[in-house]
């Protein structure tokens, strides 16, 4: 499975919903192809310890592993990449610091998408496709905005924001390479089953 294909089901951790390591294992068992460690309120040491465990699991399941924002932690745990938002380290600086990391850019408009591609992002996390409880005050681009981004860039696009089993087919119809989810998996009573259900639909649409 190549890099682009490994973006098809991208699961993001949220400790408000589930503890990271156990839920990541369950998501990987269910067919997650990428994992992102997102912790906003932990010490660097804790992020490192959790990151090491997730790195081990993602290697075991041949999945990609990304760390949100923290390039230092990504390098320390030998992650595959880092996800950077508009308020994080600039893409071109991150590339200088960590030339071998895959850099994902979170974008919320067509202009931001084009700028991120120009600056050297390897893939885009584009959203929010729908309103979401995970992030407040987020811009909603809907399917139309998502499709505009997909058609304008040549790098892979992963859709994010309010995606679940009910709307995933609609999202995939925009031509994205994959979907990123938080609550659709981490908020489920059965993480493995929720991941399996999403993966099944993705395989039906993307193959």
Swiss-Prot record:
Q: Does the keyword Transferase apply?
A: yes
Q: What's this protein's family per the entry?
A: Belongs to the thiamine-phosphate synthase family.
Pathway where this protein functions? Cofactor biosynthesis; thiamine diphosphate biosynthesis; thiamine phosphate from 4-amino-2-methyl-5-diphosphomethylpyrimidine and 4-methyl-5-(2-phosphoethyl)-thiazole: step 1/1
How is this protein named in the record?
Thiamine-phosphate synthase
> According to the entry, what is the taxonomic lineage of the organism?
Archaea, Methanobacteriati, Methanobacteriota, Thermococci, Thermococcales
Q: Which GO terms describe its cellular component?
A: cytoplasm
| Any one Pfam family match given in the protein's UniProt record, by short name | TMP-TENI
Q: Where does 2-[(2R,5Z)-2-carboxy-4-methylthiazol-5(2H)-ylidene]ethyl phosphate bind?
A: 132-134, 162, 182-183
Q: What organism is the protein native to?
A: Pyrococcus abyssi (strain GE5 / Orsay)
Provide a Gene Ontology MF annotation, just one. thiamine-phosphate diphosphorylase activity
Q: What is its EC number?
A: 2.5.1.3
């Amino acid at each position: 499975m190549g890099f682009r294909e490994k973006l098809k089901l991208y699961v993001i951790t949220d400790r408000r919903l589930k503890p990271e390591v156990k839920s990541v294992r369950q998501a990987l068992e269910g067919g997650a192809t990428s994992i992102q460690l997102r912790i906003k309120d932990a010490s660097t040491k804790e992020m490192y310890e959790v990151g090491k465990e997730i790195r081990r699991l993602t290697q075991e399941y041949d999945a990609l592993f990304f760390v949100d924002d923290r390039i230092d932690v990504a390098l320390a745990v030998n992650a595959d990449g880092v996800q950077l938002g508009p308020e994080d380290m600039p893409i071109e600086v991150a590339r200088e610091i960590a030339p071998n990391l895959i850099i994902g850019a979170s974008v919320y408009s067509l202009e931001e998408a084009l700028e991120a591609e120009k600056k050297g992002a390897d893939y885009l996390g584009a959203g929010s496709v729908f309103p979401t409880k995970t992030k407040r005050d987020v811009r909603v681009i809907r399917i139309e905005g998502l499709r505009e981004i997909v058609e304008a860039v040549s790098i892979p696009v992963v859709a994010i924001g309010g995606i679940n089993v009910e709307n995933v087919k609609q999202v995939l119809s925009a031509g994205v390479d994959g979907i990123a989810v938080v609550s659709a998996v981490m908020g489920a009573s059965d993480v493995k089953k929720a991941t399996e259900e999403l993966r099944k639909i993705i395989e039906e649409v993307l193959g």
